[in-house]
C-alpha cells in the first residue's frame, strides 16, 4: 500500500465506507466518492494534500478484491454455539481491539476485515464453548496457503476464544528461535498490546504497541492477560519459568513456545505443580474448569508422530518426543481444543486417525473439523506463479502463470547441487548479478509509486550449508556494494546500461502484461527516467544479511518505521514461517523432492499489493516444473476438501488422497506417511456402482422421480429378452444422470468414485471417440411391481446390512448381478478367436490355466456349443456350467470385448419395503456403470489414506453375486 498522510487516510476510509452502500462500483463512481472525501478531509486536516489519483487506484483495487467463504468439514460433535453466544459477550475487548488494529495499522479494508471475521467465526464455532462442563477434547485443522495470513487468522481466533472464556492459550510457533520470537511479536501486537519483554512496565507509553496504542474508551479498561513468554530471542518457556507465580485460577494466560522438547517438558512440569495448587493432588488428575486452546502453527512440521507404523506393537519407542509432549499437555486438561494451522497438510492427512495411547491420548489427527481458508483474490499463490496444465480427468482447468519466472542455467559452477561445507562459490553467476540489479530497480520503482516507507526484501537461497551461506553473503555483499558505488559515482559505467535495459526490455513489458491480467489499478506505468531518479536513495537503504542459526543478523521489520530493505541470504530459517516482508526478488536453487518442503520454501507467495509487476523469481526450469506439479496437487487436494464438505462427511470418515509425481517426488517425508499407500485411479475396464443410500425418504422420492423423467426423455424403450427395459443414450444424457446422482444427499459420501473424475473421464474420451454411445438397462427383478415409464416392472431386492441411522447399505457393497453386465453384448458373435483371447487373458490374470472354467468332457462340449452364438449367450452358458460364478469370473475379460465407443449403465430399482426409513418409497434407484477397456485413458497415481482405501470397497467388483431376498 502507498504511504498515506492523515488526510489521505481519512479520505480513503470515508470513500471506502461510502462505497459499501453503492451497487455500482465503476471507476467513475469511485472517483466521485474519492473527490468528495478529499474535500471533506481538507476541512478536518488543513494543510495536508490529498493525492486523488493514488486514492482512486487504491480504492479501485480494493473494490475488485473478493474472498471465498471458508470450506468447513465437521463431524458435528460440537453443537453450534458461537453465533448464539457472540451477541451476549460485552464488549468483546480482545476481538474489537484486534479488528481495529487490522483496520488502522494494517490498513485492511472493510471487505478484508469482514473476511477475517467470518473465517474466525467459522473456526471458533467448531471448538467447544468454554462454559461447557464435563470432559471434552477437540482436534481440528485450519488449512491456509503459504504466506496468506495464517498468523492474522489465528490471532483473531485467539482473541475471540479469550472473549468467550478460554483461560489458557498455548501457541506452538515453529522450531526456530527467530520464528518463535516473531510469532510472539504478533501476539504482543494483536493480543497483549505491550512488548512482552517489559511485562512489569506494560503501562509505560513507550512499551505499548499494536492494540495497546489504540484509543477505544467504549471498551473500558484494557483486557487483562498474562504472558509467560516474551519476544526476546531467548524468551521461551525455560526451566526457570516453571517458578512463575502466575496462578491458573487468575486471569487468562498465554504462552508462545518453540516446538522443542525442553519448553514443552517445562510446561508439563509447571502444569503439574500448578494443578496441585488448585487441589488436583492425585497424579494424572486432569485440570478442570480451565479450558485450554492450543494453536499449532506449521502443524505439519515436528508435530507429526513419524515413528507410528502400521502393524507395529505400541510401546515407548514408536512415538516421537515432540508429538508425545504435545499430547501429554492436552491430556493434562479436562477441557481442551487443539487447532493445527498449516499451508501444506500433506503430512497431516496421513496421521493414523485411530492412534490412541494411555498416557498421551489420541493422536493429532483433525477428527473434529478441517477448515479450508481460501485466500482473497489478490493472493499470489502457486497457481499464479507457476501455473499448471488442464486436466480433463479430474476437471481442473489450466492456470496461466504470471510472467515473473526467469530461468537460471549458469549456476552449476558457483552453486552445484551437491557440495561440501568447504565449497567456495567463487564469482557470482551472471543470473544472480542480474537478480541484484532487479531488486534495486524494484525498490526504486516502489518509491516512485509512493511506497517509500515500505519494507523490501530479496531472498537468496542457494545452499543449506551454513559455512557456504557465509561465503555467499560475502560475495553478494561485495557485488551489491559495487553496484551501489556505480549508481552513485559512475554514471557512464556499463551497470547503468544493464539497469536501463533490464527496466525497458523486461520490467516495462511484463508490467503491462501483469497489469492486464490482474486488473490492478495501482500498478501504474513507470518510465526509466522516474525509476532511475530513485535508484541512489533506494540503494542506500539496502543491506545484506545472513539468516541462520550461527548468525546474529535479524529481520526486525517492526523496528524499522522508515522501512527495511534487505537482501537475505539463508536457507532453513527462511523456509518455515519466517516472513520476508515486501519480498520482490527471489533467487532460489535449493532442491527437495518433498511437496510440503518445496512449497514452504516458496516465500515468494503472498500478497504483493502495488508491486506484483516488480516481482521476479530466478530459478531452474526443473524447479519451476516441480512447483507447477505441486501447485496442481495442492489445488486437487483442496477440491477434495470441498467435496468432503459438500457430502457432509467427517474428517475421520472421508478418505483423502494426493496426486503423486511421475518422476519420483514425494508427497511428504516417508516417515510422515507410513499409513499411506499408492493407488491408481482409472475407470478403463472397470465397474463403478452405488451401494450406499440416504434413508431420507424425501431425497429418494426425488431421485426416483428424476430417474423416471430421465429414462422417459431417452425416447422409446424396448423390452429386453433377458427381462427388463433397454434404451440407448448419448454422452450428454449420461453426464446429466451422473450430475443428479452426485448431488448432496443422493449418494453416500463414501461413493467417492462418483466425484468429478468419473464425469471428467467420460468427457475426456470424447477426444478419441470413446463412450459416445451408451446402453441403458433396467433389469427386471422378482419382487413387487412398480411403474417406470408407464411400464410395469418387477423390483429388485437387496437387503439392508447397515446399522447406520442415515444410510442404507448393501451387502458386500455390491448392487450389480454379474450376469447383467453382458446384456449389451448380445449382438457380438462369439468366435473361436474371441473365446481364445478371453481365455488367454483369464489365464494371465489368474496366473495359470483356467482349469476352474473349462474341463474336459461335459464342460468342453458346453464351450464348443457356444461358438457362433452371441457373447452374451456364451457367457450365460459358461455360467451355467460353473454355476453363477461364471460371468463373475470372466467379466474383466468380457469388458475387453465391449467397443471403446460404448458404455453400459444398469439401473436397479430397489424394493425398500423392509428398509427402515424407506418403507413407503416406491423404489430406490441404484447405478452400475460398466466401462470398456481402453488404452487411451491416462492412469493417475495417488498416495491415499487408509480411510480412502476403506471407502473404495465399492470400486472393486466382488466375485460373489449380490445378496438377494426371494
Predicted features by range, described:
Residues 136-154:
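Walker A/P-loop
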Residues 332, 544-627:
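Conserved RecA-like P-loop NTPase helicase motor core
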Residues 591-612, 730, 739-966:
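C-terminal accessory/interaction regions of large nucleic acid-associated machines
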Residues 151-165:
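Walker A/P-loop NTP-binding motif
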Residues 18-133, 184-189, 195-289, 293, ...:
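Low-complexity, highly charged intrinsically disordered N-terminal segments
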Residues 258, 270-274, 417-447, 463-466, ...:
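C-terminal catalytic or substrate-handling cores of phosphate/nucleotide-
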